[in-house]
Amino acid sequence: MSVLQVLTFPDDRLRTVAKPVEEVTPEIQKIVDDMIETMYDEEGIGLAATQVDIHKRIVVIDISETRDEPMVLINPEILEKRGEDGIEEGCLSVPGARALVPRAAEVTVKALDRDGKEYTFEADDLLAICVQHELDHLMGKLFVDYLSPLKRKRIQDKLAKIKRFNEKQQNA
C-alpha cells in the first residue's frame, strides 16, 4: 500500500467530476487500499478519489474511534435525504479551515464494496454528513463552495500564505 498525495484547494483538479467505476478490478482494489492508508496517514475520517487526483467514483470513510472500520463506497449514490443538520466541517484538501455546512440529517446510500458487491445502508449524524461531504468531492464540489465569497477568499489567502511559508522553509 502507498500513501497518496492529497490535493489542496484551490487546485483545479479538485473540480473534476469523477467517472463511474466500470468494474471492480485488482487495480481498483489497490486504489481503495491506498486511499484507506492515505486517509489514516492524514488523520482524516473520509477521502474521495478526486482528492488524490484519481477521478473515479470511489470514497473511503472511517468514523470509528478505533480507526479500524473502513467503509468502501464505489459508485456511491444517495437514494434519499431526510431532515436537516450541519456541523463545522473540515477537509484534508482545505487544511486548517473549518465551517458550518448545512446537510441532510439522514441519508440512504447505495454503493459497491471493495469486492464489487452492491449494498445499501442508512446513515445519520456524523456518518451522514461525511458521506455527503465526500460525495460532493466526486462532483467537483468542496465545502468552501457553501460559504460566502468573502469567507472562501479568506481561506484561499490563508492557504496561500501557509504554502509560501512552507516553500520558504524548504528552501532555507
From Swiss-Prot:
Free-text remark on how the cofactor is bound: Binds 1 Fe(2+) ion.
InterPro entries in the record: Peptide_deformylase, Peptide_deformylase_sf
Cofactor: Fe(2+)
Keyword Hydrolase: yes
Record keyword Endoplasmic reticulum present: no
Record-linked Pfam families: Pep_deformylase
Binding-site positions, Fe cation: C91, H133, H137
CDD domains linked to this entry: Pep_deformylase
UniProt KW keywords: Hydrolase, Iron, Metal-binding, Protein biosynthesis
Gene3D superfamilies linked: Peptide deformylase
Entry's family note: Belongs to the polypeptide deformylase family.
NCBIfam families according to UniProt: pept_deformyl (TIGR00079), PRK00150.1-3 (NF001159)
Task performed by this protein: Removes the formyl group from the N-terminal Met of newly synthesized proteins. Requires at least a dipeptide for an efficient rate of reaction. N-terminal L-methionine is a prerequisite for activity but the enzyme has broad specificity at other positions.
UniProt-recorded name of the protein: Peptide deformylase
